[in-house]
Every structure is written in C-alpha cells, then in structure tokens.
C-alpha cells in the first residue's frame, strides 16, 4: 500500500513537471513574448563583452571598445598590438552552423533566420579579411567560452600579444 502511494505521488509530480514544461514552451512561442525578448538583445556592451573587458582591464591592458575606425567595429581593439577581438553570440553568429541550421529549419520563420545568420557569417568573414589586410590579428570568442573560460580567453589574447611583439622585434632586428 505504501509503495503504491509513493509511486502515485512520484507519477503526479512527474506529470506536473512535464505539464509545466509544455506550458512554458507553448507560452514562450507567443509573438509578443518573443518580440519582448528580442528587444532585450543588445549589440554593444553585452554581458560577455563587459566580462572580457573587465578581465583585460584588470590585467592592465588598455583598449578601445566598438572601434568604428576599423571595418566591422570590433568589440575590443588593442590598438597598441593591432589586435581586434569579437565577442560573438552562438546563435547570431552561427556556432555549429550545420546543427543550428537543422534546428532553424524546424522552427518558426526559418527562411528569415537562416538568411540572417548566413549573412552574419559571411559579413564576419569579409570583416576578418579586411582587418587581416590592415595588419590586425583577429580573434573571435564565443559567448559561452567567455562566460565559462575567461582565463583561457585572456591567455589566447596574451599569446597573440606575445606573437605581435615577437614579430615586431624580428622586424626591428632585420632593419639594424
């Protein structure tokens, strides 16, 4: 008898959990809620940018933010070292694009989203080419990498700084 009551309680809680999930998913597809959520997404001073900038500042690196002088207005630019850093969100810049594309094809308004993200990806590629032509080192970080592995991101930036300094020293030595 006790086993039966315990099982019923467990099944009731499980059913309640799934009902809440279904209601939440259904409610989150409401166009007004989607529109409200999209308005909260910023293109400048995002949480991932702020986190990386704070870490760079703490290490003593000075930078320009959203530097409009350069193509693509990189999120962070270390002008002294000619390093352009982009903090990319996984969705809008198409991380794991083939998988994301399949998910988008099943969702609402797939043509719009696929076209938008493909355009973002090609624009990112063109921007990178322009910056490389200008002699900049270009670094892209995914948002989750910044959130979860900020120290590793800093280490990658410091390695790029070291590479820049080393190549500049080599050029100076050859001129002497």
Name each model-derived stretch.
Residues 9-176:
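Nucleic-acid endo/exonuclease domains
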